[in-house]
Curated annotation (Swiss-Prot):
Taxonomic source organism: Haemophilus influenzae (strain ATCC 51907 / DSM 11121 / KW20 / Rd)
GN (gene name): uup-B
Protein name (record): ATP-binding protein Uup-like
The keyword Nucleotide-binding appears for this protein: yes
Taxonomy of the source species: Bacteria, Pseudomonadati, Pseudomonadota, Gammaproteobacteria, Pasteurellales
Localization: Cytoplasm
EC number: 3.6.1.-
Principal EC category: hydrolase
UniProt feature, compositional bias: Basic and acidic residues: 357-375
Amino acid sequence: MEAIEWLENFLLDFQGSIVFISHDRSVIRKMATRIVDLDRGQLQSYLGNYDLYLTTKEENLRVEALQNELFDKRLAQEDVWIRQGIKARRTRNEGRVRALKAMREERRQRREVMGTAKLQLDTSSRSGKIVFEMEDVSYEIAGKTLLKDFSTTILRGDKIALVGPNGCGKTTFIKLLLGEIQPTSGKIRCGTKLEIAYFDQYRADLDPEKIVMDNVADGKQDIEINGVKRHVLGYLQEFLFPPKRAMTPVKALSGGERNRLLLAKLLLKPNNLLILDEPTNDLDVETLELLEEILTDYQGTLLIVSHDRQFIDNTATECYLFEGEGRLNKYVGGFFDAKQQQANFWASKAVEEQAKAKKSEPLKEESAVKNDRTSKPKSVKLSYKEQRELEQLPQLLEELETKITTLQAEIADPAFFQQAHDITDAKLKALADTEAELETAFLRWEELEEKKNLADGKA
């Protein structure tokens, strides 16, 4: 995801024109100022951002459907006229006949809107309340620590996204849970009554030599979902595989078609634990949105590995973020909520470290000041410079508090973490520095106030 964000910001800074193709809605929303839509062989240009495109496209399709309905009604009326009796045919208007032929040709060439996949899950019996327990789990391979002293409890109904760069250990984490590999140290306990459906990013569950139909039904004509028998060809049409395409070998399919096929096969399995490892690769936006709806309503436990930020945000209720050197932290919410919490966490850590550093300074200076106050009461009076400083400190404190409020508001904005890392890091550092500066200024104000009170005989 860091690479995606870097590319976004690199392209946003680019001064020339950019043409890009993407199914990543976050990328499109952030970058596109004009969208060219390819629909049924026709290109249509939409000015504006992605959300405006969706609204305009929906309205265009509504108008098109209405126009087609009126056209078909008129065509049916003309067909009735041309089939009238002998008398009507003798007196028919040749121009009207030619117009009817043109209408029939126009109707023949019309390309209907491509359907969307119709997905449904074969639900299973409920698992036990505890699905997985991990206690101080670590995992190392080839001298590299992927996981260090991690503990968690995954409960029935949890929807967790594993987020991190390639190679950080997301798939390894899943293999640890499933018992395919053993941890270097720590304990992992599995719950009861688990029925697992696993979407593998490598599509290992598909036989490339078999045709689409046989991959799903294993040579049978019927499949069963939720206790109801279906013909396999009818089921595959819901995943946008017409009968002819259902007879095609898997090795001839596109990446998107293979992912749809894997979903078709996966969703047939009764399950209460669904593991999706990069399910969004090559899926079109309509199928993505339908999958999101299904996962939102899913009653079982869900584990997701994905680089699609919008997909995670729409499906996950908790995120596990891989932060390097074996660190894995848990954050409540979708992707953007998790990233904001992560930034706030590390910003507060930075403030704590700075505060500790100040407290650990040698105490000699503080002791000398105290001795000076007790042994030299005559010199306790504020100097002119200190008096000026004391007068200016309230204004400085107010300015620092205003700056902190402004920075906190910027960081709380969900769009904040869509900026380049150097920008977000600079803002987070500025917040930590300003909070430290405020603390220092406040301590100085207290010190000067105390000195002034001593001079005035109030202490």
